[in-house]
């Protein structure tokens, strides 16, 4: 009988072991609940900065000191979160939501950009304008092709040089006419020769005078009969 009694005690020991495992499983849930409690309840630093800058009516932008005052008035702890404010300003400037009008880094004045959408649209236009200079490069070969035409125009210029030679020949051809005009007085000499012919005509009239002699001879022959 004494040998069989320890068996139930051995079975009770393993049954008590699963209880710590359940407690370990419950602990992660508590840790998750602690993580939820750490999340800040409210807007982020960047949202607070953008609201404060948009609320300001200054044309030159909101300074860092004025921004801290606006955040402190909204219940934000500026002294503890000073580094977060500076990082938030730098990130907003890099994204393009804010424009830094004065100063460098986190110090200076800031204002909202006019329209974030317009900034994105202007960037592609600049790329298109950068692509436009490639077109003039294509036009340059055409201009180079037009240059040989100018060389052809230079070849045509000798024709102009030939024209003066032709005009010189025409002038030389016209010059004999002037010589002929100088020879015209010879025609006047030829015109005098008809006058001599007129002087010869009276000689031809002498045979007419011979006719009366023939008539006298006929009369003499008639008398002899």
Swiss-Prot record:
Keywords annotated in UniProt: Acetylation, Chromosome, DNA-binding, Nucleus
Start-end of Basic residues biased regions: 123-138, 146-163, 171-189, 198-225
GO molecular function, one term: double-stranded DNA binding
Key word Lipid metabolism present: no
Cellular location(s): Nucleus; Chromosome
Keyword match Zinc-finger: no
Disordered as annotated region, ranges: 1-46, 94-225
Main localization, broad class: nucleus
GO CC term, one of those recorded: nucleus
Superkingdom as given in the UniProt entry: Eukaryota
GO biological process terms on file: chromosome condensation; negative regulation of DNA recombination; nucleosome assembly
Biased composition (Low complexity): 1-23, 31-43
Pfam family, one: Linker_histone
N-acetylserine PTM sites in chain numbering: 2
Domain H15 positions: 41-114
Role according to the record: Histones H1 are necessary for the condensation of nucleosome chains into higher-order structures.
Similarity field: Belongs to the histone H1/H5 family.
Protein name listed in UniProt: Histone H1.11L
């Amino acid at each position: 009988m004494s040998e069989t009694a320890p068996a139930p005690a051995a079975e009770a020991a393993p049954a008590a072991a699963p209880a710590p495992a359940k407690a370990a499983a419950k602990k992660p849930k508590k840790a998750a609940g602690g993580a939820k409690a750490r999340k800040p309840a409210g807007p982020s630093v960047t949202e607070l900065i953008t609201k404060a800058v948009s609320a300001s009516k200054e044309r030159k932008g909101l300074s860092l000191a004025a921004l801290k005052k606006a955040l402190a008035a909204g219940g934000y702890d500026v002294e503890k979160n000073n580094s977060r404010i500076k990082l938030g300003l730098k990130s907003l400037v890099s994204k393009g939501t804010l424009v830094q009008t004065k100063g460098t880094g986190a110090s200076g004045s800031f204002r909202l950009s006019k329209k974030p959408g317009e900034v994105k649209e202007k960037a592609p236009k600049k790329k298109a304008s950068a692509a436009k200079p490639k077109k003039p490069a294509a036009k340059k070969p055409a201009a180079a092709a037009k240059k040989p035409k100018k060389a052809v125009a230079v070849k045509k210029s000798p024709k102009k040089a030939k024209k003066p030679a032709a005009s010189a020949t025409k002038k030389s051809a016209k010059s004999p006419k002037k010589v002929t005009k100088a020879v015209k007085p010879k025609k006047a000499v030829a015109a005098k020769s008809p006058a001599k012919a007129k002087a010869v005509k009276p000689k031809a009239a002498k045979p007419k005078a011979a006719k009366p002699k023939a008539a006298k001879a006929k009369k003499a022959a008639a008398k002899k009969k």
